[in-house]
């Protein structure tokens, strides 16, 4: 098993000893070379043999050959830990386990001294890591290889270029440069990545350490397992008496097996060469001397013994080879001249690097030249010569060694000698077998003997020589720099006692032209001084505790003397930087050091200059940011930052390799084109896209050689962590940067000269460049967006004062750029004005042209509206935020007042980051602001029309205080239809003619600039009027669409209709066309859309200035069809409402009114059925509106005005086609027209009275329109009466329609005369006539045409004048159902006043034209009796008394009461009415036949 507590140390043939290894226990004086206790190990053949304790096994059960010793966390030792170390005695030091517990050192007295592992320096731990360099390539090799590649490419180009034609030369140069550039870009990436190579190497070393520890742990486990397996074989057997008798009797054991003899019996001595034997014995003697007798200083603890020599290695100083004459005498024996050390060879452990490495290696090689090396050997032998006892004491008093009083702390370069145990066994105690002479001498008191320490003297001598050798190398490099690279910018001073080297840099900076007034003395040069000094010693905790606990013992003084002999004074090179106090105060670190393995004074000087430059730039940065100049108030800390750039320095006369270095500069972003816009309210703000700059950011740098300040433009991104967005932006800004390089170079060169003359000029120059850069950036953004830009407008001074008082004082404060909104918006401009606080201020300006008193045209500012960018950003971030319900509040916006943000939006604005106010304008923001201003102007024009018409409106949504239009009552919010934009709510009852109470939901799905622009909400009662407001929901939406596109801009009015049906279909109708932009085609100017699912009517027009008049015109046209459709739907569902009112189920009536088709200009519905060719057919009516027009007559230049009105067309359609119509909602137009052709039209009986019906409807509609203001429900009653008139007259016209044609061919058939829509006359023999009239309350009157029915028809003129003064009747008596005839039946109605003269004249003409029918009372009674019989039979069949037709005989007339069309049993009553006309004709003809002679 390994003896080391920290792992198995590999043993090699050379016995390598590590400096930081854990010290072995003190060896016994009498037996210094006792072999360690062997352990059992197994070889590859499976045999077991004795192995030393230092041998470890790897994972393959073989002897480990790794040279790395896992001694992590062990304190440094003065005595080396030999690989063939002896076993630790019981009183040896105890170390902690691997879990990090403190280490306890036990002394001979049993006391424990604690060493805290946390005090072990990190650098020491890193040095103990194994170096893992596999699969790594040196960066220097890559740099050198690529440099040679570039040089070779240029040579080939120079050789082949003259032979090429002129056109190919440019291509050849471009391709060569491109190929070389690609390789160097790869090298740049590797170089930037190599800054973390130290961390990567450390990680690889730690991984290697962990891997090695893992394998060693596995080896330990395997060894323990093997021991566990073989331990049973080592059990002691019972006493073998026969064997013991044989051994005692004969001296041998004759029964010994041959295998045991081969393993246990010692082999014969080797017969090797004598020289090898001597070397081996010498190595043993050297080991014994170094381990037991010699006082070895701590720096020389790291040594190896091989080839008969001791090889010492002091890192950073030297490597020496020594030998001795023997194993040395006892430490108490006086030194002898024959027993001494000899210096054989010497090599300095230094490496020169940098550009002067080649010349330094030639002048100062690591192994000194022969002559100097021989002198050093002689001087070293003098230091190693033994010192006699008396001479040694005098020499120690005259020239004592620098001995530390206490041990230094762990982690320093000074190595601490182990403490000698005070109770260690003496020589006599350890070796009892010593001769009697020595025993007698030990009993006698002896005087103390001063021990000689030749190795300490040698180390002090060689340390001094090594440091002087390093100083010579640095001095040589400094003179080489002055001779070649730096020239007169360096001054060198040297001194010998003490040895130092001083280098002054930037010696010509203040003496140069224009550099006498630099930034005080901060830019002046400094100096670097290198001196050989004594390194400070720090007493360690272990030595201090030992002095406290062992101070009373006599042995402690002996231990202290022994330790003091091995402790030497360490010396080294110290670097001191001297510069101005402000520079030293701003410097990051003043700790400069020189590594012996990388001696490069140029690198040291560059490091000092970098710190000087960095401190100088910080000083300038503070001056720029905290000054009272306008530029300082404009710039933010992130706009003036210190940046780091990795550059490649080309080779020079010393080396052709390319070196990667860092470069500090001050980056000043004047126009701040890359300022991020972030808000506090956003938890994870997204960075905006950075726009490319027309003028790159400026960099203020310092020339490292001359020390002059340089101002230049930023060619590309300089930071090492470039994102993908920044990379794409570099490509985007390539063109702009190239175009501005040449003019900027001369401007910046002149600015650099002015800065070197006076630092105050820097702020003025930067401010002018800032204004110039902003205007260029704004103009470039406008060009990218396709916007025109104007630098100046011909504004008068008084108009400029309206833009701010500072515009008159400074030209830079006035607006620098004006952007016209749109060609159609003449006079509107976006004014961009530089601002110190906000970066840019944007105003919407409206200007008009005026004439000055001198007659010169000028522009006058009529209105200015400053846009608050912070409020716009806050409102955009809160899209869709809900506001408070304003209920019935309805505020009309006055003309000329500005929109004001509500308090909620103001509160959100306060949460915006304060840095946003200083953000610069971006392309996205400019586009949003431009679009937002176009929307403002567009809405202003629409609002202007509303104010002219006196229509109040509200702003809804966006950043207004209303997220929804007002409702009549507070109700539960319902989910809005997506097609409505949340403007209209659904009816509570689900019907079409429900209450106007509505719930409202705010708009959703709106983002971008559209979220900032509110829509307009109007009341339907104001827009449509009180008589039409019932057709739509209470609110109407009015908004401008596509305002950012001039060709697609349109105004949209959305009206939610109060009707729904499955017969609806989506409609789109273009009502006006206009020429397109290319003047070659036409496009829609005004169109109407109807959504069948949401019943949403959308009126759209592109005429922004006349949108309200267009909407009103087209609504009047569509409104008539909507009103008729609504009444048709109500009539078709009347039976359902009756069933709900009576709370009983009822059967759907067959002769009900049903909607067939709804168009924007026509409505088709059915109202009954008829048998055609044995098949049932539906009776259809198509109602259209025709506008008034002027028609030219033939052969006449004078036109005839055709009055407009409703057109009624009657047709028919089979019932099976009605079912197909329900399935095919997209029925073609030609199929609908076929329903109303001549064939289908003749099948409808109402065709005979179509003219009278049209006249009646138009007269009633005009009368209702005239009285709409007083009676808003009049127009609704017109269509209700029309529908009931169709149903009431249907049974009559079914019988009269055939008579119209038969009377022309049959003489006995009476002639049918249709007097009006409610008055039918049957003429018999041109002398007699029967009138059938439809009266009020669904009553039918049959009378003789020759006699007046009522006395009111012959009332005198006096009674007429009295009746005219009567009051108007209620609304229910006007145009209610069949009340279209109340002008004939009721003398008190309003219609009576108008038609009374005509009625009287018609009655007088009838009395004079026709004669009385003989015995008319008998005829009417017989008809009455027959109708009662028919009604009784039908009632019995239907088993319902409600179906009976009530007929009243009035003597001279019959009064028949008709049931309502919605009654479930109305069909039975209408079937009885069908017998009235044939029965009446038969009875009259029979009576006339009997009375005729």
Curated annotation (Swiss-Prot):
It holds the Pfam family Med14. GO terms for molecular function: transcription coregulator activity. Residues 1-51, 71-110, 408-427, 674-693, 894-913, 957-997 are annotated as: Disordered. Keywords: Activator, Nucleus, Transcription, Transcription regulation. InterPro entries: Med14_N, Mediator_Med14. The keyword Nucleus applies. One of its GO terms (biological process) is regulation of transcription by RNA polymerase II. Residues 90-100 have a biased composition (Basic and acidic residues). It is found in: Nucleus. It comes from the Eukaryota. Its main location: nucleus. The keyword RNA-binding does not apply. GO terms for cellular component: core mediator complex; mediator complex. Component of the Mediator complex, a coactivator involved in the regulated transcription of nearly all RNA polymerase II-dependent genes. Mediator functions as a bridge to convey information from gene-specific regulatory proteins to the basal RNA polymerase II transcription machinery. Mediator is recruited to promoters by direct interactions with regulatory proteins and serves as a scaffold for the assembly of a functional preinitiation complex with RNA polymerase II and the general transcription factors. Belongs to the Mediator complex subunit 14 family. Component of the Mediator complex. This is Mediator of RNA polymerase II transcription subunit 14. It comes from Mycosarcoma maydis.
